[in-house]
């Protein structure tokens, strides 16, 4: 994922 966001980073 984006990496900078805990939720989007996991995707």
Curated annotation (Swiss-Prot):
Instruction: Give GO BP annotations, semicolon-separated.
Output: neuropeptide signaling pathway
What GO terms fall under cellular component here?
A: extracellular region
Please verify whether the record's keywords include Thylakoid. no
Keyword Cell inner membrane attached: no
Q: Which UniProt keywords apply?
A: Amidation, Neuropeptide, Secreted
The cellular location(s) given in this protein's UniProt record come to: Secreted
Which residues in this protein are found as Arginine amide? Answer: 11
Tissue-level expression reads: Expressed in the CNS and midgut but not in the ring gland, thoracic perisympathetic organs (tPSO) and abdominal perisympathetic organs (aPSO) (at protein level).
State its role: Myoactive peptide.
Task: Name the chain's protein.
Answer: Tachykinin-related peptide GLGNNAFLGVR-amide
Species name:
Delia radicum
